[in-house]
Swiss-Prot record:
The gene is glyA. The modification N6-(pyridoxal phosphate)lysine is found at residue 229. The record marks 228 as: Plays an important role in substrate specificity. Its EC number is 2.1.2.1. This is Serine hydroxymethyltransferase.
Length: 416
């Protein structure tokens, strides 16, 4: 029998110490990695529940194990909520990650050797959309589209490539693209050539749910997403699809890729979906975009840095660092020492290697969750620029770190 007195701190103090150190880092650092966010206490409570004990291969009402009557309720709640949130005909909430959701789409609609088309990773796409080292690039013939001279998606070139190569699947979505994507235009060319149209909305899902970014669901055959990032749920994946594709997608997830789903994570997803259906979540997403725009404006117009694509229409943007004679790798490290967390990121036509890069990616979801508004966003942008202007100046770094501490103290992630 387990005792409630046997806490993690008592059972495994070594791990407890590491967790507490990470908690302090999250509280004391300004998080600007676009793919990261903070979940609510309610989400964490669901994820730490007894549902972690239950094995439940299959789907609600059709399991391979007994005793699933209560986890069936939890999963159906998650399905119903995510369908309502995006206006989807059908949904699968079992993917353990966005990458596994994407693999399921490829398994459902393509055979090894088929042609797929996605956005070039070097110009803002995602590795699961055809990167040579990823299974999507190893198993399929990949045709990549990219950006035009204005660093916007080259829709004309995309259409020419689609007509020429006639891919089985056309993928829209990105991990480092700041502008709105014209999903309707993608859908038209997919329909013209008879391709499956798949949207990976992982980065934009929360914005879409709140109505601040185009919704791909009416246009796409299938839509995948993570449940963290802007959606502010636990780490995991989802798939939305037309009803006609539900059987193929469900079979691709189970038994195709996964066995028993993580029921505690599905419960946590359900909580996050409920939170996303509230007016407060819509207000949050409006602030996410406002904060990103302020940071991009300050860094670009006031501090002399080049913003890729010239602006942001979402939660994220890339910064070209070459004018400062600093690499993305070095900028990530020095900003981290000042308690500002970003990630190095390749920019279009980047001369540096992917682990060095000429740019950084900046996102506003996490800082907005802790209550930052345009006022703090402007301050943060200036702090970033201060560090980039004098990365070797210890006095500057100490001053920035002190100001970061003040901002974080005024806006804790988890209040008491």
């Amino acid at each position: 029998m387990f005792s409630a007195q046997d806490t993690l701190a008592k059972v495994d103090p070594e791990l407890w110490t590491a967790i507490q150190a990470e908690n302090r880092r999250q509280e004391d650092h300004i998080e600007l990695i676009a793919s990261e966010n903070y979940v609510s206490h309610a989400v964490m409570e669901a994820q730490g529940s007894q549902l972690t004990n239950k094995y439940a291969e299959g789907y609600p009402g059709k399991r391979y194990y007994g005793g699933c009557e209560h986890v069936d309720v939890a999963e159906q709640i998650a399905i119903d909520r995510i369908k309502k949130l995006f206006g989807a005909e059908a949904a699968n909430v079992q993917p353990n990650s966005g990458s596994q959701a994407n693999q399921a789409v490829l398994m459902a609609f393509a055979k090894p050797g088929d042609t797929i088309m996605g956005m070039s990773l070097a110009e803002g796409g995602h590795l699961t959309h055809g990167m040579p080292l990823n299974m999507s690039g190893k198993w399929f013939n990949v045709v990549a589209y990219g950006l035009d001279e204005k660093e916007e998606i080259d829709y004309d070139a995309m259409e020419r490539l689609a007509r020429e190569h006639k891919p089985r699947i056309i993928i829209a979505g990105a991990s480092a693209y700041s502008l709105r994507i014209d999903f309707e235009r993608f859908a038209k060319i997919a329909k013209e050539i008879g391709a499956i149209f798949w949207v990976d909305m992982a980065h934009y899902a929360g914005l879409i749910a709140a109505g601040y970014y185009p919704n791909p669901v009416p246009h796409a055959d299938v839509v995948t997403s993570t449940t963290h990032k802007t959606l502010r749920g636990p780490r995991g994946g989802i798939i939305l699809m037309k009803a006609e594709h539900e059987k193929a997608i469900n079979s691709a997830i189970f038994p195709g890729l996964q066995g028993g789903p993580l029921m505690h994570v599905i419960a946590a997803k359900a909580v996050a979906f409920k939170e996303a259906l509230t007016p407060q979540f819509r207000d949050y997403q409006e602030q996410v975009i406002a904060n990103a725009r302020v940071m991009a404006r300050v860094l670009g117009e006031e501090r002399g840095l080049r913003i890729i694509s010239g602006r942001t229409e979402s939660h994220v943007f890339l910064v070209d660092l070459r004018s400062k004679n600093i690499t993305g790798k070095a900028a990530e490290a020095v900003l981290g020492s000042a308690h500002i967390t970003v990630n190095k990121n390749s920019i279009p036509k980047d001369p540096e290697k992917p682990f060095v890069t000429s740019g950084i990616r900046i996102g506003s979801p996490a800082m907005t969750t802790r209550g930052f508004t345009e006022i703090e966003a402007e301050q943060v942008a200036h702090l970033i620029a201060d560090v980039l202007d004098a990365p070797q100046d210890e006095a500057v770094l100490a001053n920035v770190q002190a100001k970061v501490a003040e901002l974080c103290a005024r806006h804790p992630v988890y209040g008491k």
